[in-house]
């Protein structure tokens, strides 16, 4: 049986030698990062522009590929850049990254 790292609903993520507290969201397919944080970290280049559906309607967002470390697991993921300044967490980790890292989510952590 493969050992799976347990993660909670929020986790510390390292991106470009910067610690960010990210929200783990199994309802989101992809990962997202705040546009101001992306600018501060100088993320890029933009690899795609995709259309996303949200409660506010449809938006087009830039997508970058970046390496992150989550629970000692290093992985390259796609991050869409969005305005998250009104959100509690500046980064969101979606299902694609969770599958890639083979994580087990423990909501009590």
At which residue positions do the language-model features occur?
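Pepsin/retropepsin-fold aspartyl endopeptidases
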Residues: 1-109
């Amino acid at each position: 049986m493969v050992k799976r790292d347990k993660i909670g609903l929020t986790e510390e993520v390292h991106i470009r030698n910067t610690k960010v507290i990210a929200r783990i969201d199994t309802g989101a397919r992809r990962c997202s990062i705040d546009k101001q944080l992306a600018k501060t970290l100088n993320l890029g280049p933009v690899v795609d522009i995709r259309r996303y559906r949200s409660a506010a309607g449809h938006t087009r967002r830039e997508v970058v590929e970046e390496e992150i470390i989550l629970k000692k697991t290093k992985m390259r993921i796609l991050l869409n850049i969005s305005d998250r300044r009104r959100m509690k967490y500046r980064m969101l980790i979606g299902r694609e990254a969770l599958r890639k890292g083979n994580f087990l989510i423990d909501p009590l952590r």
